[in-house]
Amino acid sequence: MSKLTIPGTVGPIEIALDGELTSPRGVVLLAHPHPLFGGTMDNKVVTTLMRTFVQLGYLVVRSNFRGVGQTAGEHTAGPGETDDLLTVLDHIWHMDAGRYATLPFVLAGFSFGSFVQSHVAVRLAAQGKHPQRMVLVGTATSRWEVAPVPADTLVVHGELDDTVPLQSTLDWARPQSLPVVVVPGADHFFHGKLPTLKQIVLQAWAGQA
């Protein structure tokens, strides 16, 4: 892992790079849970996803949202965080003479981070750019206006989530005819269920080149 800061619109953004730098199969942009409730890029769900995508051969990019770690600024409940993730992705695309710009990219997030990634996808789509896939875990559908997502998005939610009730995510997914993978017995933070979460992602990628 390497950590560094890059220029953002309101000051530095702290990012971490994990995995394959030389010849990755793609780039994963990974977003953490709500910063005002202790969310950081070192959250256990986030690091589980990071390790899973590293195992799959990706370059994984995490960043701290505004006001967390070495990232400047104050929490904006979505708009500024969306801008910052787009800044991070653009920075990665311009690294090493643009070697990563032509690779597939994945947008992944947990809780508040999933909400932000849904809006990152909308902004990118307006530029004609589309992720290889999205992975949204414990999506904060009961607390923020989560945008519609592509039909192949992997949505994972805990059966016993009392932070974001499963029903709210089902209600969000239903009009989109979007499947939701429910982990029996899992709470919002997937305590004791992180290996299951990892296997769900690995299985979703099984057979992909």
Show the residue positions of the predicted features.
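Short alpha-helix in the alpha/beta-hydrolase fold that links the catalytic acid
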Residues: 149-151, 165-173
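Serine-hydrolase catalytic machinery in alpha/beta-hydrolase-like enzymes
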Residues: 6-8, 12-100
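Catalytic histidine-centered segment of alpha/beta-hydrolase-like enzymes
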Residues: 186-198
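A domain-start/cap signature at the N-terminus of enzymes
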Residues: 1-5
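Acidic catalytic loop of the alpha/beta-hydrolase fold
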Residues: 159-164, 188-189
